[in-house]
């Protein structure tokens, strides 16, 4: 039996997150339902990231064991897309080594977060960017972001329910202006704690509003206490953009 991987994009608006759960609509659930229709047996998948409800993906990576040796990777891609709903699309299918695991073999994960700063709401962006109609100091945010790059204990930026090792490495944070009304925060790292990126975004916004000095993020990081940080940015502005492996 061969092992294949797929790059998947999805609109997370109508999903209760990526990970399969009983009685609710999840991305993993609809993918495995589609695979069952194709191969006439339950196929279990693994993924590079478990996005929360409302979070989108441009480049989620999944892998599974394929019981059909005759289908080409293009055949598998086409069959999956024919059986998936409109808010999920398989961009590419390719073969990987039999022991490949997307969660453990990925070297870098990249997340994008979009903030729409126009004074006027755009109803077409309401599910795809955080509408935040206030001026943000991007230079101050960039200075603050530097304190988060590198290997640190990110306890202050995780949810209380995440019991994993809080030490994580952020390779780079970029804060870009996309025209006058859209800001992109790009976070690159090996792996992330639950809601870590959204909690980082909320803290950077505090700096952008000049409610915190950039150096405050160093204090928050060193506190290793979730209550020392800001809130959590909304899910719908976040995209699991890409993985490198």
From Swiss-Prot:
Gene Ontology molecular function: RNA binding; tRNA pseudouridine(38-40) synthase activity
Residues noted as binding substrate in the record, renumbered to the chain: 111
Entry keyword annotation includes Endoplasmic reticulum: no
Active site: 52
Disulfide bond entries: none
The UniProt record lists the keyword tRNA-binding: no
Catalytic reaction(s) noted: uridine(38/39/40) in tRNA = pseudouridine(38/39/40) in tRNA
GO BP, one annotated term: tRNA pseudouridine synthesis
EC numbers for this chain: 5.4.99.12
Key words, A-Z: Isomerase, tRNA processing
Pfam families per UniProt: PseudoU_synth_1
Function, in words: Formation of pseudouridine at positions 38, 39 and 40 in the anticodon stem and loop of transfer RNAs.
Quaternary organization: Homodimer.
Family: Belongs to the tRNA pseudouridine synthase TruA family.
PANTHER family to which the protein is assigned, alphabetical: PSEUDOURIDYLATE SYNTHASE, TRNA PSEUDOURIDINE SYNTHASE-LIKE 1
Protein name: tRNA pseudouridine synthase A
């Amino acid at each position: 039996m061969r092992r294949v991987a797929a790059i998947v994009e999805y609109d997370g608006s109508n999903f209760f997150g990526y990970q399969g759960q009983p009685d609710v609509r999840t991305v993993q659930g609809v993918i495995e339902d589609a695979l069952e229709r194709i191969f006439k047996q339950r196929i279990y998948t693994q993924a590079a990231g478990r996005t929360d409800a409302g979070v989108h993906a441009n480049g989620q990576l999944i892998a599974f064991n394929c019981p059909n040796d005759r289908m080409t990777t293009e055949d598998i891609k086409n069959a999956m897309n024919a059986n998936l709903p409109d808010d999920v699309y398989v961009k590419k299918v390719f073969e990987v080594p039999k022991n490949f695991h997307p969660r453990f073999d990925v070297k870098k994960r990249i997340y994008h977060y979009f903030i729409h700063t126009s004074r006027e709401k755009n109803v077409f962006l309401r599910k795809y960017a955080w509408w935040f109609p206030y001026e943000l100091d991007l230079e101050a945010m960039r200075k603050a972001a530097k304190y988060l790059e590198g290997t640190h204990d990110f306890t202050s930026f995780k949810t209380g329910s995440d019991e994993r090792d809080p030490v994580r490495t952020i390779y780079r944070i970029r804060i870009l202006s996309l025209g006058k009304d859209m800001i992109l925060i790009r976070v690159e790292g090996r792996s992330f704690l639950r809601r870590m990126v959204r909690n980082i975004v909320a803290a950077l916004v505090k700096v952008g509003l000049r409610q915190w000095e950039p150096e405050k993020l160093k204090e928050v990081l060193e506190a290793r206490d979730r209550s020392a940080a800001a809130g959590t940015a909304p899910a719908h502005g976040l995209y699991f953009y890409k993985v490198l492996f």
